[in-house]
Amino acid sequence: LINSEQDTESFKSIGTYVEIIDFNNLPNGLLGITVKGMHRVEIKSAKKDEDGLNTGSISPISEPSVDDQALLAKFPELINVLVQLKNHPKIRELPIEIDLSSADSVSYHLGGLIPLTPLDKQLLLDAFDAGQRLNILSRLIEEISSEKPST
């Protein structure tokens, strides 16, 4: 995510290392790319080359250990939402493996499947651990569910 709060163009300091798992030509002539997030990374440096390509150096971020069972027990509603999403026909087509006994897996997959703004997705990436992500997701889902549909 590009940091637009600064005068000069820069990147947020936390991102995701991804692997390309599929690509296809879209009707508008662009190339659609499907990626799988592998792990969080810290962006150490970034620069824009003469041809406009952004390059940089990164280092992986180790996830802190959490008590998955105790943490997930605090958020049964989030697991329920994720199970419902996981069973949706369009989601079942995706090559994702969700471990419902892992707080990291639940928080990252739920954050990737619900409609969030780029800033909210960055907020999840910036969270220290799965506990913070689950707290943020709980609040965001509550906000989404309390929004009145536009007529």
Task: List the predicted regions and their residue ranges.
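N-terminal low-complexity, acidic/polar interaction/targeting segments
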Residues: 1-151
